[in-house]
Amino acid sequence: MARETGFTQLHFERGAIGDCAGKNGAADLLIALHACDTATDDALHHGIRAGASLILAAPCCHQEIRAQLTPPPVLREVLRHGILAEREAELVTDGIRALLLEIHGYKASVFEFISSEHTGKNLMIAAHKRTQPHDPAPLRERLRELLAFYGLRSQRLAQLLGE
């Protein structure tokens, strides 16, 4: 595909993210489409570690946070319904991912990239590397508050980044 499109420096890897994550060092662009559950976190971690100037991820499956989600009292009546708890876990997971990207020097945004009539998994996390330094301390405090609010003990990307 790279040859056919004239992008001779474009390289595709097939396999587990961890198996190819250290091969080339730096990366200009990281794209992860529908990497299941914590595979999205592995991909984001690789992009951050490689210093990618642009990271695009379309997450899929959010079991890690769903299993831990402990609704705060104010949300218990709403999140006692399985489908609502599942959707909340998806939003919280992707919100944490965007926040972690911001903590680690990226400007992140989350948006719908394809109509929900085609797929329910239609969120895109986009992040570009900041050119100016920033103070991550206030963002780290927000992360701690968010994790505590939902009773979350761990999140894969946070662990990989040492947060």
Please report, for each region that a protein language model flagged, where it lies by residue:
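Class I S-adenosyl-L-methionine
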Residues: M1-E163
